Each structure stands twice: as structure tokens, then as C-alpha cells.
Amino acid sequence: VRSAAILFRAHGYEHVSVENICAAAGVTGPALYRHFKSKQDILVTVVEEPILVLLQFARATREKYGSSPETLDRLMKNHINHMLDGTGALEIFSREQESLPQEKMSELRRNMVEYVQIWTESIAVTCNVDLETARVLTYALTNAINSLPNYRRTLDKEQVRAILWRMCQTIVQADWPATVEDAAPAGQ
């Protein structure tokens, strides 16, 4: 699965063959087909498992700490670690959605919506803002985290991790208006 994820991330799902995956994984076609029915099944596994891991962590953290600053800190750290240490599954998911079966796509979207909602509720409490403002902050944080692991040309992983953590802390600790309406610049 990891070999397939690396290939899908580097070349795109449509440009990777089962033969490419087998060669990268060091297995034969028949061995691969004992575990997966098709290349599409491999794609589903590549994106589904990491999304479920993120969601299960978020659920367990919320269960233990509620929608609190502690929950948000743990969500941010886990998301940063997942993006830096993982296979790029969220990037692949975002780019290859049309290659997924519709039923599976709907399920994955529901999981992502729940994941975002847990973040949003924790940000609302931590930053003392309404849910709409918290949702904007959630997307700003997660999209920034999701995009920066690709920029490791001159920095090592730990340097990127430190920058991402500092960025998240700066955003969360900023003095945010309580509502979206309060966020508009004066005179608008």
C-alpha cells in the first residue's frame, strides 16, 4: 500500500499501472490480486486508512478532553505528524477523488466532514469565536499543514515540523473577533 501511495502521489493514479505497483512493492501480480480486486481497491485503501486513523484519533481525543485547548493542541500535533510522516494520503484523496467509487467517496467525505467538525468545535472554544469563524480557521490551519510538507527542499522534517507548530500556535493565540461579522474591516 505504501509503494502504491508513493507512486500515486508522484505520478497520479491514472499514470500508475498495477505492474508499476508490483515492481515497487517487490511482489507479483497474483500476490497483489490476493489482497486487492483492482487498482481502484488499492487507491481506496491508500486514502481510507489514513483518513480513518485521523478521525479515530480526533474522536478519542474529543472523548477524553472535550472541545478544549488540549484537544486542539493534540489535533494540531497529530495532523502535523501525520502529514510529515505519512504517505500523502490526503493529497492523493484531494487529487484523485473522481477515481474513487461514488459510494466510497461519499463515506470518505462524511469522515472528513466529521474530522473538520471536531477541529471546528475545538477552535471555537479555544479561540472564543463562533462556529463560522472557527470553520474558516480550521480550513486555514489544515490546508496550510497539508500543503507545507511538500516544501522540504532546504529544510529537514524536524525544521518543517517546528515551523508548522509555531504557525498553528500563532494562529490559535491571535486575538480573533468573536463572529464573522466582527471580522470585516471598518467601513465595509
What are these model-predicted stretches?
Residues 3-41, 45:
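Helix-turn-helix
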Residues 5-8, 54-55, 72-83, 91-93, ...:
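Short, structured motif recognition centered on aromatic/hydrophobic residues
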Residues 10-14, 65, 86:
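Short coil/turn segments at alpha/beta junctions that flank glycine-rich nucleotide-binding fingerprints
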Residues 44-50, 93:
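Alpha-helical DNA-contacting segments of helix-turn-helix folds
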Residues 45, 59-85:
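Hydrophobic alpha-helical connector segments
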Residues 81, 117-125, 151-188:
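C-terminal peripheral helix-coil segments that are non-catalytic and often amphipathic
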Residues 83-103, 150:
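Amphipathic alpha-helical segments used for helix-helix packing
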Residues 102-128, 135-139, 162:
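Amphipathic alpha-helical packing segments from all-alpha helical-bundle domains
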